[in-house]
Amino acid sequence: MLTEFNSIPATEAEQGIVSDLVRTLGPISFTLQQTADRIPTIWIDRDIVHAVLRHLRDGATRRFQMLYDLTAIDERQRVHRDGLPKSDFTLVYHLVSFERNDDVRVKVPLAEGALEVQSIADIWPNANWYEREVWDMFGIGFAGHPTLFRILTPPTWTGHPLRKDYIARATEMGPYILTEEKERAEQEALRFNPEAWGMKRHSENSDFMFLNLGPNHPSVHGVFRIILQLEGEEIVDAVPEIGFHHRGAEKMAERQSWHTYIPYTDRIDYLGGVMNNFPYVMAVERLAGIEVPSRAQMIRIMLAELFRIASHLVFYGTMSQDVGQLSPVFYMFSDRERVFQIIEAICGFRMHPAWFRIGGVAADLPQGWDRMIRDYLGYQSKRLDEYDKLVMRNRLFKARTIGVGAYTLEEALDWGVTGPGLRACGLGWDYRRQRPYSGYDQLEFDIPICHNGDCYDRVVVHIEEIRQSLRIIRQCLDNMPPGPYKSDHRLTTPPLKERTMQDIETLITHFLNVSWGPVLPPGEAMVSIEATKGINGYYLVADGDTVSYRTRIRTPSFPHLQMIPLISRGAYVADLIAIIGSIDFVMADVDR
């Protein structure tokens, strides 16, 4: 039985949420948990999950409109669980309210012999994929789910990889031998069965065609398969199939130190560079209690915005190519090369510098950095004006994108859309403005919005974000504060080398942090940022060790791709190519 509300000290936000639940649902049992991220965290019994989440979405005074994330934790080997309900596996629902600019985390304890709860796919449609992922990775079932199939691993996979008793290294497996019989079985498992997805093979007038688009197709932007149900060339329905790029990024975190996992984050949104490091190191710093110096914060912002520009240029060029223009993609990749020259001069690497550190950045800015950036700022602004004439005013580009792939603001919130895709529907919500981090509150920039939510508007928002990133970088250039580029906190990694020969304590700390990695105190924290493709967050569970007990990577592209059937029904295959291009995703960000 869980603890009653009045016996637990609660924040004002928790008081309001729980009091609202009690008024509506009557007496309920729950536990309140304090976390390092200060997000109200409420444990409830599995029998009332559906009712509680339904109320938080539809009946609360200020609704939590978005299911931001849904994941699980295998608690069986966790040591530090004082004051928490007994649980073998824990479901974690993370909701966001844009009205109150607040979050709530709902946790559900499950016993190993009773791993099933009611599905919430009827409340939030984006829960469909999240629940499939939890089933695939942990073996937790969801009663009433329409298609509870594996999603990141092949249909023939055995076991649930994010369980603690599942092996973490390929060297722990036996040799892999692909016999002809096994190859045929694997291929047969990939055969699409329309009935399993609730699809009909025939209409009243004709037979439907089922077309595989991908996984090897240049217009699906990665190893990604969409099964299209067609009547003629019109799309009746679609089934996106992901997982071909899954590499076990979350599992890898359980065997890397807090420091050595940083390069792995670069490979999630592989066009975002250090933008991937940002939420991870901030989550570690939140757990460790590290305060980052102002110079390091400003350097982080500047590098993140440079990578935002680089990523958006790839989007702009490939989107124009997808709808029939060839020249722009070459021009924009040339511009991205200029950005990479600056990044390489500062970080030493181009696409994946892994340059952020726990407590700061890897090194101070090199001599002449300001001149390189100042030259680039003047160059890129003029190029954007030329691209506007070349692409955005082109009547064929407009014909292929205006009114195509549109969704409403309500649909965007239901499906978990964030970033440019959300702002294209008219909601000017940007993490850098609404919940500023790393010093963004000291900078002036606008939040571009549109109102039609179609392919064209999504491109417009991306372009205007490039202009705002240039504006932010100029302010970083003109107002870079003096001071250290790394915190002197004892858990900063690597620690300051200068102090190692002065006293024994810092020498010991340096040795331990470099050889074993820092030991973080037990706790939990979710830190999110406004990344290139939407809101990206890292949910870390520390158990007093040198490695993460659980690392959850919440990426924007995962829910975005799930919308494809909704916005492609009734369109043509050619329209689908424009729709896919306008979403702005990479498959590593989806599959992790």
Swiss-Prot record:
GO terms for molecular function: NAD binding; NADH dehydrogenase (ubiquinone) activity; NADH:ubiquinone reductase (non-electrogenic) activity; quinone binding. It is an enzyme of class 7 (translocase). The keyword Membrane applies. Residues 1-183 are annotated as: NADH dehydrogenase I subunit C. GO terms for cellular component: NADH dehydrogenase complex; plasma membrane. It catalyses: a quinone + NADH + 5 H(+)(in) = a quinol + NAD(+) + 4 H(+)(out). InterPro entries: NADH_DH_suC, NADH_DH_suCD, NADH_Q_OxRdtase_suD, NADH_quin_OxRdtase_su_C/D-like, NADH_UbQ_OxRdtase_30kDa_su, NADH_UbQ_OxRdtase_49kDa_CS, NDH1_su_D/H, NiFe-Hase_large. The keyword Transcription regulation does not apply. Pfam families: Complex1_30kDa, Complex1_49kDa. It is a peripheral membrane protein. Its EC number is 7.1.1.-. Transmembrane segments: none annotated. It is found in: Cell inner membrane. Keywords: Cell inner membrane, Cell membrane, Membrane, Multifunctional enzyme, NAD, Quinone, Translocase, Transport, Ubiquinone. Residues 207-592 are annotated as: NADH dehydrogenase I subunit D. NDH-1 is composed of 13 different subunits. Subunits NuoB, CD, E, F, and G constitute the peripheral sector of the complex. HAMAP family: NDH1_NuoC, NDH1_NuoCD_1, NDH1_NuoD. NDH-1 shuttles electrons from NADH, via FMN and iron-sulfur (Fe-S) centers, to quinones in the respiratory chain. The immediate electron acceptor for the enzyme in this species is believed to be ubiquinone. Couples the redox reaction to proton translocation (for every two electrons transferred, four hydrogen ions are translocated across the cytoplasmic membrane), and thus conserves the redox energy in a proton gradient. In the N-terminal section; belongs to the complex I 30 kDa subunit family. This is NADH-quinone oxidoreductase subunit C/D. The gene is nuoC.
